[in-house]
Amino acid sequence: MAPTKRKGECPGAAPKKPKEPVQVPKLLIKGGVEVLEVKTGVDAITEVECFLNPEMGDPDDNLRGYSQHLSAENAFESDSPDRKMLPCYSTARIPLPNLNEDLTCGNLLMWEAVTVKTEVIGITSMLNLHAGSQKVHENGGGKPVQGSNFHFFAVGGDPLEMQGVLMNYRTKYPQGTITPKNPTAQSQVMNTDHKAYLDKNNAYPVECWIPDPSRNENTRYFGTYTGGENVPPVLHVTNTATTVLLDEQGVGPLCKADSLYVSAADICGLFTNSSGTQQWRGLARYFKIRLRKRSVKNPYPISFLLSDLINRRTQKVDGQPMYGMESQVEEVRVFDGTEQLPGDPDMIRYIDRQGQLQTKMV
């Protein structure tokens, strides 16, 4: 029987080389918003960290993140909520560095949003059951924040596109809010006339607008709604969850005009005061967005750029309508070349569908 081999390295053998360290992105610079002005290489990756504060109504300086006390009307016809009762969407535009000095090239570089890490900030603040909330038991703590809650965020290269849907089309919304125009009973289900862009912070009530699923090709949005009277908020805290923003073709939102748009709405539920009144409670949302540079075909022909430049330099006048359905333009004449003097100046000349010059007598 042959002797068994000894385990381990042979005496005098050269020691094994340690494994090479794993390759990770090299950090060039870190700082505030001024870092976005630094020019980087084609393969550079940029990470932007930001947060959006909630827009719940803020009835006074001491109640930031709360709405005004809610009140319900007895009839649909008399519904007229106060401005500060209405939680609204939060939104912001983040300017990114300009990547293209020459816009006449066939290919351009654009920022592409690849991933996002996000979470609601301040979850544990709702553990405070001793600050003016209604008592559950005579000698116990207060009632926790509970009830219908909505959590939503969006990241894109364009403002979020919205579809308006109303609970009650007869509701009279206050000034300072942007709501669907000319609502009808059809507005309580689906009315394709109610379209809008989320282009203003603290102006679009959450109860009136939802993201438009038929649009938003250049935006990624995520949201959950849980309804009920005594539903507890269920939220998570982690820095390990990453949401991929790429579509089925592997392309993320492309930031047009070097602009990144973020939106959010985090309504955690209702806070019940000791008097029995209730207020919406909202929290802020944190974002960490990773962007890379992507080569794309130039969508802007030079003629379009020159025309846009000239139009921007033209003085704008808010005057009477000269185009559209109510145009006040009566007649347009086009002259080309010369001809012998006609004996009838009232002849109507036009070019037909086949491109032939036709003459019609009045």
From Swiss-Prot:
The lineage of its organism: Viruses, Monodnaviria, Shotokuvirae, Cossaviricota, Papovaviricetes. It holds the Pfam family Polyoma_coat. The modification Phosphothreonine is found at T338. Keywords: Capsid protein, Caveolin-mediated endocytosis of virus by host, Disulfide bond, Host nucleus, Host-virus interaction, Late protein, Phosphoprotein, T=7 icosahedral capsid protein, Viral attachment to host cell, Viral penetration into host cytoplasm, Virion, Virus endocytosis by host, Virus entry into host cell. Homomultimer; disulfide-linked. The virus capsid is composed of 72 icosahedral units, each one composed of five disulfide-linked copies of VP1. Interacts with minor capsid proteins VP2 and VP3. This is Major capsid protein VP1. It comes from BK polyomavirus (strain AS). Its main location: virion. Signal peptide: none annotated. A motif (Bipartite nuclear localization signal) lies at residues 5-19. InterPro entries: Capsid_VP1_Polyomavir (IPR000662), dsDNA_vir_gr_I_capsid (IPR011222), Polyomavir_VP1_sf (IPR036931). Belongs to the polyomaviruses coat protein VP1 family.
